[in-house]
């Protein structure tokens, strides 16, 4: 069969498997996930060995340090993948939940019940842990899932998917409930995006070019997981030590991920003292700072920021920085340049914190906390499918509930419409 025919078959079989998944009891889904987690631990040496093939190929292709970090699996990261699956197993099952019930004047009882979306297609790059995270969330929420990972992680993804699919068979669940498209060519993505008859939604996770390609070519509704141009605004009332701890964590703990800090905004009233303070802290950790004119006035060694820097997701130890007139200017800057991912304010002023929360137009808005907490696990969702920067059908980190929709249920006692 051609690539197009094979992908159509994968999608059609996933559609059939989705009906079985939708009927699966919560206890059965939970046991499946627990067995999947154990299988990952038991087969960790094989996963790591396959991952080495991807890392070697990535080094030969000249992938950046950030990309290689996203790609790399070791024993601790495989354990983290298994732990994330276990966390999903422990979460309440949203399927079948009645979210409201009301009585009409004619005594009809009307309600809304959560149901699976059906078949979810996920297209992603670099991070092989997405394979297990996506499988766990989609299966727990009663969906079938069709995965298409990046060519740079093909060996890792195939190893993980094969291990997980084996557990489906052991539990008597159609193996097509979890499929990984094995074709690394772009044709595989193109054909997947044509399967509107079988796939209900596409969730792309990756770089700007991938997101744009999916949006422009998909016949299926898309929930975008765009880049993370994350901001922190240091207000005039901020505690300097708290601000330093948060900023250093947000920028340097793991710079190659989408919730790392990319732009720092500083209130003009504290610029004279705070800019040298934070410049010294970050430059000592090898962070390159690119500042506007006022920032460079107080940190002369900083590089000059250009217009492109305000839009940049660096994913490395580079940080854009600007001094702003106040809260209004900070909010305006964020709403202009943000990718709608995650923003944080460091402040001692409650009123300012509430204005920031209300007026900043992003999926996650924080007060006195690192942007690195913008993560499904950290926010109590369990493993996340990603962080949506699309307001429909979900916004921010997507957990189990975000992989369901609702249908109306109506109870009558013989009513007919007059």
UniProtKB/Swiss-Prot annotation:
**What is the originating organism of this protein?**
Citrifermentans bemidjiense (strain ATCC BAA-1014 / DSM 16622 / JCM 12645 / Bem)
Protein name, per record: Gamma-glutamyl phosphate reductase
Q: Which domain of life is it from?
A: Bacteria
Protein family: Belongs to the gamma-glutamyl phosphate reductase family.
Q: Name one GO molecular function term.
A: glutamate-5-semialdehyde dehydrogenase activity
Q: Which gene encodes it?
A: proA
Keyword presence, Acetylation: no
Localisation = Cytoplasm
The record's keywords, sorted A to Z, are: Amino-acid biosynthesis, Cytoplasm, NADP, Oxidoreductase, Proline biosynthesis
Give the matching InterPro entries.
Ald_DH/histidinol_DH (IPR016161), Ald_DH_C (IPR016163), Ald_DH_N (IPR016162), Aldehyde_DH_dom (IPR015590), G-glutamylP_reductase_CS (IPR020593), Glu-5-SA_DH (IPR012134), GPR_dom (IPR000965)
Q: Per UniProt, what is one Pfam family of this protein? A: Aldedh
Q: In this entry, which stretches build a coiled coil?
A: none
Known SUPFAM superfamilies for this protein?
ALDH-like
Q: Which GO terms describe its cellular component?
A: cytoplasm
Question: What is the role of the protein in this entry?
Answer: Catalyzes the NADPH-dependent reduction of L-glutamate 5-phosphate into L-glutamate 5-semialdehyde and phosphate. The product spontaneously undergoes cyclization to form 1-pyrroline-5-carboxylate.
List GO BP terms, alphabetically: L-proline biosynthetic process
The EC number(s) given in the record are 1.2.1.41
Claim: Oxidoreductase is one of the keywords in the record: yes
| PANTHER family in the cross-refs | DELTA-1-PYRROLINE-5-CARBOXYLATE SYNTHASE, GLUTAMATE SEMIALDEHYDE DEHYDROGENASE
What pathway does the UniProt record associate with this protein? Amino-acid biosynthesis; L-proline biosynthesis; L-glutamate 5-semialdehyde from L-glutamate: step 2/2
Reaction catalysed?
Answer: L-glutamate 5-semialdehyde + phosphate + NADP(+) = L-glutamyl 5-phosphate + NADPH + H(+)
């Amino acid at each position: 069969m051609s690539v197009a025919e094979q992908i159509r078959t994968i999608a059609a079989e996933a559609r059939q498997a989705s009906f079985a998944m939708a009927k699966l009891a919560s206890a059965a889904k939970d046991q499946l996930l627990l067995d999947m987690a154990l299988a990952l631990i038991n087969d960790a040496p094989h996963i790591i060995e396959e991952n080495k093939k991807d890392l070697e190929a990535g080094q030969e292709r000249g992938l950046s340090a950030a990309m290689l970090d996203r790609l790399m699996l070791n024993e601790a990261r495989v354990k983290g993948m298994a732990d994330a699956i276990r966390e999903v197993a422990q979460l309440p099952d949203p399927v079948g939940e009645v979210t409201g019930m009301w009585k009409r004047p004619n005594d009809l009882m009307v309600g809304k019940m959560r149901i699976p979306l059906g078949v979810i297609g996920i297209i992603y790059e670099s991070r092989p842990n997405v394979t297990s995270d996506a499988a766990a969330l989609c299966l727990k929420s009663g969906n079938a899932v069709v995965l298409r990972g990046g060519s740079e992680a093909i060996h890792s993804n195939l190893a993980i998917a094969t291990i997980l699919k084996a557990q489906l068979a052991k539990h008597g669940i159609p193996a097509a409930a979890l499929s990984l498209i094995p074709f690394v060519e772009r044709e595989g993505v193109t054909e997947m995006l044509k399967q509107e008859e079988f796939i209900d939604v596409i969730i792309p996770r990756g770089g700007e070019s991938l997101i744009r390609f999916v949006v422009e070519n998909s016949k299926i509704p898309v929930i975008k997981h765009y880049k993370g141009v994350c901001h922190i605004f240091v207000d005039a009332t901020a505690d300097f030590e708290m601000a330093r701890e948060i900023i250093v964590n947000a920028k340097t703990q793991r710079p190659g991920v989408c919730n790392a800090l990319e732009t720092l905004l500083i209130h003009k009233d504290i610029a004279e003292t705070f800019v040298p303070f934070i410049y010294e802290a970050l430059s000592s950790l090898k962070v390159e700072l690119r500042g506007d004119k006022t920032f460079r006035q107080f940190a002369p060694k900083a590089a000059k920021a250009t217009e492109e820097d305000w839009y940049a997701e660096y994913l490395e130890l580079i940080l854009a920085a600007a001094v702003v007139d106040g809260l209004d200017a900070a909010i305006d800057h964020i709403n202009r340049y943000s990718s709608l991912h995650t923003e944080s304010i460091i402040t001692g002023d409650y009123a300012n914190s509430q204005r920031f929360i209300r007026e900043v137009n992003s999926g996650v808005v924080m007060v006195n906390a690192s942007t690195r907490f913008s993560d499904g696990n950290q926010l109590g969702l369990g493993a996340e499918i990603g962080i949506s920067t699309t307001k429909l059908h979900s916004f921010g980190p997507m957990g189990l509930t975000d992989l369901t929709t609702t249908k109306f249920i109506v109870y009558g006692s013989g009513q007919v419409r007059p």
